[in-house]
């Protein structure tokens, strides 16, 4: 193990901005999350909220997607910012983009991610139990990972979160460790399958993803999909009588809002 120094002027500017944020908040409990958010779904949101409750400042290291079907980095940064701005306390979350840095490109080495978090002064690192390369196993019913020794040697707490699912019996997002119902009640947040739906132009149900996130993704991968989008919008949805141009993103958001309506006979 050791320190990682990235010689990149853009990264250096981001680091300076981070330290200013840390100083302004007088943050002592700083937690790191490293993910590709490809795509950003409700289980990620649950992880965010759990982390924010226990930290003065959360650093989100956004890494490149490692598979050919992955979303563009700028697109991911766009919907991540939109989500944080709308649904989380943005002053307590710092996005640290790791764009075009091959060292973290595959999001496969949690040890490197731990060193990165420690080098920035983080006191905790949160990872999911399904993180590739974590090497998780149980010894006397206690979870063990390859990061256990690193955590002790470098004085950074590593928290391994269990898998989050939506339970149709509990009617909420739960961890697989806390839910008493079987897997036949669980909806899983599988990133690859959600991407396949979006790539096919199918809107994932709101239980999987926020409408703002789905709208940004669909409007990006299907630009100008509807030649007469304005007419479709005006013909289907309520308006204030003033003809206003609606973007693809606004159209998808309105469509998703309508999907969530309940129909009463």
Which residues fall in each region the model found?
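Short beta-strand and adjacent tight-turn residues that come in two discontinuous sequence segments
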Residues: 127
């Amino acid at each position: 193990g050791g320190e990682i120094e990235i010689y990149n002027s853009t990264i250096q500017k981001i680091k300076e901005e981070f330290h200013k944020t840390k100083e302004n908040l007088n943050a002592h409990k700083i937690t790191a999350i490293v993910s590709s958010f490809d795509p950003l779904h409700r289980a990620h949101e649950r992880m965010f909220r759990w982390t924010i409750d226990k930290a003065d400042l959360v650093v989100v290291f956004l890494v490149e997607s490692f598979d050919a079907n992955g979303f563009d980095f700028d697109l991911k940064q766009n919907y991540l910012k939109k989500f944080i701005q709308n649904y989380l306390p943005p002053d307590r979350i710092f996005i640290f983009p790791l764009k075009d840095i091959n060292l973290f490109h595959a999001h496969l080495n949690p040890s490197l991610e731990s060193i990165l978090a420690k080098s920035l002064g983080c006191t905790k690192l949160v990872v999911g139990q399904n993180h590739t390369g974590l090497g998780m196993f149980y010894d006397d019913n206690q979870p063990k990972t390859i990061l256990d020794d690193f955590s002790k040697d470098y004085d950074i707490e590593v928290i391994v979160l269990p898998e989050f699912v939506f339970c149709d019996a509990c009617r909420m997002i739960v961890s697989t460790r806390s839910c008493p119902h079987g897997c036949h009640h669980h909806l899983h947040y599988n990133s690859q399958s959600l991407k396949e739906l979006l790539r096919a132009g199918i809107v994932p149900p709101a239980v999987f993803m926020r409408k703002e996130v789905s709208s940004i993704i669909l409007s990006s991968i299907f630009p100008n999909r509807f030649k007469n989008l304005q007419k479709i919008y005006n013909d289907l949805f309520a308006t204030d009588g003033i003809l206003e141009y609606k973007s693809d993103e606004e159209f998808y958001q309105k469509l998703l809002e309508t999907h969530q309506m309940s129909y009463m006979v």
